[in-house]
Regions:
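Amphipathic, Lys/Arg-enriched alpha-helical "gate/interface" segment within cytosolic domains
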Residues: 2-137
Length: 137
């Protein structure tokens, strides 16, 4: 059973952690601007790296899309920071939104990148329980 502690709560993003399980959950509460997205993702990344977070659930159902420039920024600046660590990211999406398309692009780019696939995994889910099961297996 997860024991989530809120570490960050702003208008656009809620971040909770369970330090005992090296788990982070980030819930987008609204569509962020590009600058908000980058600022918050950088904060989450710095926290995850400093605390050795290995698994993360990103609930993006209230986020409509990710700007193309932010997708590229994430691939170029954020994902490489996790190289050498075993990390699993689960995206909780809704099937009718564009949010699924942009994170699928991230997953495809990650699958084709030079980062070792055995140490960095991304999957998409419509159901939170299924996402958590995958993250903790």
């Amino acid at each position: 059973m997860l024991k989530l502690e809120t570490i960050f709560h702003k208008e656009a993003l809620l971040v909770q952690v369970d330090p005992d399980h090296n788990f982070l959950k980030a819930v987008w509460l609204k569509q962020p601007t590009s600058s908000e997205f980058r600022k918050y993702i950088l904060l989450v990344t710095e926290y995850a790296l400093a605390r050795n977070i290995k698994i993360a659930l990103f609930d993006i159902r209230r986020r409509s899309y990710m700007e193309y420039c932010d997708q590229n920024w994430t691939l170029k600046e954020i994902f490489p920071l996790f190289e050498g660590n075993f990390v699993k990211f689960a995206y909780l999406t809704k099937i009718e939104g564009l949010d699924l398309m942009d994170t699928l692009r991230l997953q495809e780019a990650q699958d084709n990148s030079t980062l070792q696939k055995t140490t960095f995994k991304i999957e998409h889910f419509l159901d939170e329980e299924q996402a958590l099961t995958w993250l903790f297996e």
